[in-house]
Regions:
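Active-site glycine/GP-rich loop and adjacent strand/helix microenvironment
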Residues: 3-12, 16-18, 102, 111, ...
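Active-site diphosphate/adenylate-binding microenvironment
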Residues: 15-65, 73-78, 86-101
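Short acidic, glycine-rich loop/turn motifs
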Residues: 28, 68-70, 247-249
Length: 261
């Protein structure tokens, strides 16, 4: 069961991950006790900025880094086997949207594309390749070219995924309002330092109006967690079966927050 698997993973992490082992010893008086998911201590993401979080002794195949302004300390996620990440994001996507080969994937990821070691760019690049569609690809600020590409795909009834960071989608939709039928617009977040940060309902309402869509989809992922959750409307996210979300109290890492979630 999910609970049994979680306990097995917890015990493995506790035994072989020195950073996690030390953290659990500091906050949990019974680390060897069998745990249900709600009782498993979560590792603060700040540790990914301060320490090398690795389970076992191996040479990393890739180091993913979180986004941040110049001079900011970023999270670093050491990955032993990229094939596991690829299997995770592909199966997670296809559970919600069907085979990636049915889609033309257009990625509007400026700032992310301009820096190295982004897990989001890695995922988008692999999805573009896995789609097998000759017109899949990345876009930076060439909005006119992107608008022409989407219009051509729409005219052929080609299911298209436009995966984009928030500020770029807003800029694109402001300059090129369109009436979309076969295109799924999926935002990945990303408004920091780009003026007033809209609430998600405000963002989706703006994009829905400018692109004539019934809803805006969303992807949630993070450098420190190599799994994604997807929302098809209304901000309700669905996780793959190997992922479950709990909100912890900031001043008590073992307590589940139930109000305001």
């Amino acid at each position: 069961s999910f609970d049994e698997l979680c306990n097995t993973v917890f015990q493995f992490q506790y035994q072989y991950n020195p950073v996690y082992h030390k953290w659990v010893d500091l906050i949990d008086s019974l680390p060897s006790e069998r745990k249900i998911p709600q009782k498993i201590p979560a590792l603060p993401i700040s540790f990914f900025k301060e320490q090398q979080v690795k389970t076992g002794n191996w040479q990393e195949q890739k180091i993913f880094e979180s986004s941040g302004t110049t001079g900011m300390v970023t999270s670093r996620h050491y990955v032993a086997n990229l094939a596991i990440y690829e299997q995770s994001f592909l199966e997670g996507f296809e559970r919600q949207y069907g085979s990636i080969q049915n889609w033309c994937v257009l990625a509007l990821l400026p700032t992310y594309l301009e820096r190295e070691n982004s897990s989001l760019v890695y995922m988008a690049n692999k999805m573009i390749a896995m789609s097998g569609h000759s017109e899949s690809g990345f876009y930076l600020y060439n909005y006119a070219e992107l608008a022409n590409k989407i219009a051509a795909l729409e005219s052929r009834g080609q299911p298209t995924l436009l995966l984009g960071v928030t500020f770029a989608l807003l800029d694109f939709a402001a300059q090129f309002p369109m009436q979309l039928t076969y295109t799924v617009v999926m935002e990945t977040g990303g408004m920091k330092g780009r003026g007033r940060e809209l609430t998600r309902p405000e963002l989706h309402e703006t994009l829905i109006e400018r692109l004539s869509l019934p809803s805006i989809h969303a992807e949630y992922g993070m450098t420190e967690l190599l799994s994604q959750a997807y929302s098809k409307s209304g901000g309700r996210y669905y996780c793959p079966p190997w992922m479950k979300v709990f909100v912890r109290k900031e001043d008590d890492p073992l307590a589940i927050l139930t109000e305001g979630t």
